[in-house]
């Protein structure tokens, strides 16, 4: 009985998988419209450089090729997010398409130019980006011609590097781009075009965040907390440390924010510095309050030992509070990034 039950479950599982595969294949076939010609498209990225976050753009040098069957020529394309077209270069592989042994037409081109990408900097300096290159056909709408990826994996030069960034791989996809306008041409309706997109995933290395941004700030925080280990009677020395720490934190914030474009929101690092400013100001206020208490009661017996113990406890609580808040901000940033992927 048990063996018969397992065989029945296995049969149901196999039937389910076959049904899902058939449904997926039917859905893919249903996406092709009557009279629509398919162009299999691939990209081989050679170089990507001059990544300019302030201008939201980058330069790319790559090959793009097309394989198709039919009379419609897919070579007359527009790079939708191309900018500075006066410096754009385009060199075709062949003057006329080649006939491949499998019956496909083949041609391509080498492209070099600047492309636009809106950088989302909410998670700076742990930000990740998908740099995209978008193409559409100028002559034919989606119901006549559709671009599809030539293979499951996009191609990138083997020794491809981007200094200051980690490369997370590349993808190609095809989607519909609907223009909800007739561009002023009477009698025409909104038009949809096949939009082919190449995406390169990049991310800043964690070492940039830890060593260049967090380490200097952590040193400033620890130096400011050192004021709570100085004798309560030495008010000038106790105040000078957090004041110096506050000025240093302001200068450190300016050093990285000057390299970012003007955005209307706080990036992750701004939020970390906001926590730092609050902690340093709290240290300074604590030093002032304790100093005033000692000055007022200097003619009386003041339990300085108790004050020093309280200050040291506050120092440890302060560093713990800072670490917990930073970890909370990092967790919120990670959840936000995961929601956008």
Name these PLM-found stretches.
Residues 1-10:
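Bacterial N-terminal signal peptides that target proteins for export
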Residues 10-20:
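Bacterial N-terminal signal peptides
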Residues 16, 319-331:
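Hydrophobic core of alpha-helical transmembrane segments in multi-pass integral membrane proteins
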Residues 25-201:
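Soluble non-transmembrane domains of integral membrane proteins
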Residues 177-178, 307, 315, 329-332:
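Flexible extramembrane loops and terminal tails that flank transmembrane helices
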Residues 197-321:
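Channel- or pocket-lining gating/hinge segments that regulate access to a cavity or pore
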Residues 307, 323, 338-340:
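Acidic, carboxylate-rich catalytic segments that either coordinate divalent cations
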Residues 328-341:
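Juxtamembrane boundary at the C-terminal end of a transmembrane helix
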């Amino acid at each position: 009985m048990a063996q018969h039950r397992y065989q029945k479950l296995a049969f149901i599982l196999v039937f389910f998988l076959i049904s899902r595969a058939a449904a997926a294949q039917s859905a893919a076939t249903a996406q092709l419209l009557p009279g629509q010609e398919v162009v299999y498209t691939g990209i081989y990225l050679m170089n990507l450089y001059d990544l300019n976050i302030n201008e939201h753009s980058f330069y790319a040098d790559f090959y793009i090729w097309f394989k198709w069957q039919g009379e419609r020529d897919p070579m007359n394309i527009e790079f939708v997010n191309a900018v500075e077209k006066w410096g754009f270069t385009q060199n075709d592989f062949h003057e006329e398409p080649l006939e491949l042994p499998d019956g496909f037409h083949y041609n391509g081109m080498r492209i070099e130019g600047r492309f636009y990408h809106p950088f989302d900097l909410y998670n700076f300096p742990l930000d990740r980006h998908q740099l995209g290159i978008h193409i559409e056909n100028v002559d034919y709408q989606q119901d006549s011609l559709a671009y599809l990826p030539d293979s499951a994996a996009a191609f990138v030069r083997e020794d491809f590097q981007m200094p200051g960034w980690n490369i997370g791989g590349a993808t190609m996809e095809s989607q519909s781009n609907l223009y909800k306008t007739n561009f002023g041409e009477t009698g025409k309706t909104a038009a949809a075009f096949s939009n082919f997109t190449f995406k390169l995933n990049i991310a800043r290395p964690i070492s940039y965040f830890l060593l260049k941004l967090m380490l200097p700030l952590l040193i400033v925080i620890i130096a400011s907390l050192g004021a709570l280990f100085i004798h309560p009677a030495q008010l000038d020395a106790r105040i000078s440390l957090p004041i110096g720490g506050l000025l240093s934190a302001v200068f450190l914030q300016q050093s990285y924010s000057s390299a970012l474009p003007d955005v209307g929101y706080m990036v992750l690092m701004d939020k970390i510095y906001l926590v730092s400013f609050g902690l340093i100001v709290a240290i300074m206020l604590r030093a002032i309050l304790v100093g005033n208490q000692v000055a007022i009661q200097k003619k009386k017996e003041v339990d300085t030992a108790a004050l020093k113990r309280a200050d040291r406890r506050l120092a440890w609580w302060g560093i713990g509070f800072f670490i917990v808040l930073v970890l909370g901000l990092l967790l919120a940033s990670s959840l936000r990034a995961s929601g956008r992927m």
